[in-house]
Amino acid sequence: EPGVYVEGSHGIRHENEMVVRKGEKNEYGQFMYFETITFVPFDLDGLDVSLMTRYDIEWLNAYHAEVFAKVSPYLNEAEKEWLKHATRAI
């Protein structure tokens, strides 16, 4: 769970809600997978990209692309511009 904690002051945590779905079933058994059901961007200003792996960055960029694709159709132009900036690739 990503978060920022200011010692002796406060903390902020970002969490997504997920559901577990049945996936493929094969000779090894029933596989499950997670489906994200909340789509809110991470605050990019709160990230120290130097601590992130290539996988972390690729995951975040893909997640932000999905956030924009799912949420933007419900927004007016000013809100879309804000979301476009908030979900920009890093």
Where on the chain are the PLM-derived regions?
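Charged, cofactor-coupling segments
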Residues: E1-I90
